[in-house]
Amino acid sequence: MEKPFGFVVIDKPSGLTSHDCVNRLRKVFGIRKIGHSGTLDPAVTGVLPIAIGDATRLISYLQGSKAYTGIIQLGATTNTDDMQGEIIESKAWPLITQNDINYLLENFRGEILQKPPIFSSVHIKGERAYKKARKGEKFDLIPKKVTINKLNLISWSQNKGELLVDVDCSTGTYIRSLARDIGDKIGCGGYLKSLRRTKAYNFIENHSVKLPEKSDFYPEEDKPKVLNPNIFFKHLSSFELISEEEIISWRSGRKISFQNNIKRLKVSKNNEVEDSFIHNNNILVLNKENKILGIACLDESFAIKPKVVFNAIG
């Protein structure tokens, strides 16, 4: 039987860690080589891409923003910047209109400096910030640049003090920090009450499936569909190997001549081909059936140089 190869996109339920979902799928497929991309906190639900089999070697080549829908609770701050933490300060939220809030949100659109939550996985002198925070240690985190591509106010409840927002942002953005900072800007504090991820890289909600229930046995028909990885790498240019000789050379780790075969390069909208192609730009290598054979780059001699080779020989 052919080994599974591709991605399963789980609609992560609340209460489980991302690693819990990976462990469940390891039991479902009966293999260890499974890994996720883009950790979600236990309370967060939504799109969790999980690579199956050798597709784990493609994780580092994923690109794209992430999108979320969340509720920001005004009138309090917590030590974790979400509802899982302890309330450390409370203050009544002001009488404020949706137009007022939209005006304030303009401060958080585009490239901004953001300080991560103290309960986060950021490293401080070799130790995770959340471990230091749990021990009661005092420390300060350095703000980092993140990009908020979209920040829309969907609704505002004056009675509940709740903002429902839609966010599209760069990888590494903390929505908890965004909630905290928006609350500070309004002047009453705030924290993230709930969060759902709707997009991660090129994975969207329509790709997602329910996490299989715990079981000692998973019949084939109950296993989630493994999606072809090609559809998630459209940001990469691709090159097709057309002869058996080329494929054997590729699987043996040898370079493939490119200079006379430039017409076989399909350029993604993210790249441009000119007289001098950008060296070391990642290229998806495919066979005639559009199956991924690996990842390559162009070297100085204008040859396709293997970086990731699937089904290697020799």
Curated annotation (Swiss-Prot):
GO terms (BP aspect): mRNA pseudouridine synthesis; tRNA pseudouridine synthesis
EC number of the protein: 5.4.99.25
Tagged with keyword DNA damage: no
Keywords: Isomerase, tRNA processing
Any matching Pfam family: TruB_C_2
Record family assignment: Belongs to the pseudouridine synthase TruB family. Type 1 subfamily.
Primary role: Responsible for synthesis of pseudouridine from uracil-55 in the psi GC loop of transfer RNAs.
Protein name in UniProt: tRNA pseudouridine synthase B
Organism: Prochlorococcus marinus (strain NATL1A)
Organism placement in taxonomy: Bacteria, Bacillati, Cyanobacteriota, Cyanophyceae, Synechococcales
